[in-house]
């Protein structure tokens, strides 16, 4: 058997998440069906993260074992041919050692959440952003977000159905930046609790529109009680951005609709936004 590492991009709308299940189509199922059409053997595809229904990915990493060496380029082209016309694409493939595991070898995972912060609703990005019409201040959100960085009990930001053994996680980075009409929340950690990013975003949104203060956010964290924090942000705006493995460095952030602006740079100042808000 030959093991291949895949980098996968997908639009999560219309799928019941990553993990194969009986009640609807999933990303894992689609990849496994494409792999079967390639090699004629039932193949399990393992992912770095199990994204929920409606959550997207720009850099999900997966691995699978094939019965012989096809060549990475052939694997990528064949899988993409069998995946069409689904909104799933293998954007990179590489042969790896048999001890590589997409989930257990990962050292760090990064997510980006997109909030469309304008009065007009989304058109082309419908289902790909969380639309919030009321004015929000990214700088205030970013300052408050630093309360959550570090090693904490994140019970207040954990889904009731979370299966993790412990609610304690180390959040390496949490940054909030404005990119035009959008507010981007970037989160980086070795691993996350179920719904942790969406629950943090939903709570930070309350800070951004002035309903909460940073002190209240801190109190919510320290309460270790889900009811103490804010609502769960919808899946639409969440993107599994990238995975880092041993020997790799985090990719630099790029300004753009799906990436962060470089830290310290604000493409649109908060004061300008307030003046132009209609």
Curated annotation (Swiss-Prot):
Biased composition (Basic and acidic residues): 267-278
GO biological process, one term: tRNA pseudouridine synthesis
Binding, substrate: 111
A Pfam family reported for this protein in Swiss-Prot or TrEMBL: PseudoU_synth_1
Molecular function GO terms recorded: RNA binding; tRNA pseudouridine(38-40) synthase activity
InterPro entries recorded: PsdUridine_synth_cat_dom_sf, PsdUridine_synth_TruA, PsdUridine_synth_TruA_a/b_dom, PsdUridine_synth_TruA_C, TruA/RsuA/RluB/E/F_N
Keyword Lipid metabolism annotated: no
Domain of life the protein comes from: Bacteria
Keywords recorded for this protein, A-Z: Isomerase, tRNA processing
Reaction catalysed by this enzyme: uridine(38/39/40) in tRNA = pseudouridine(38/39/40) in tRNA
Similarity comment text for this entry: Belongs to the tRNA pseudouridine synthase TruA family.
Job description of the protein: Formation of pseudouridine at positions 38, 39 and 40 in the anticodon stem and loop of transfer RNAs.
Record text on subunit structure and interactions: Homodimer.
Protein name per its UniProtKB record: tRNA pseudouridine synthase A
Annotated source species: Rhodospirillum rubrum (strain ATCC 11170 / ATH 1.1.1 / DSM 467 / LMG 4362 / NCIMB 8255 / S1)
Gene name of the encoded protein: truA
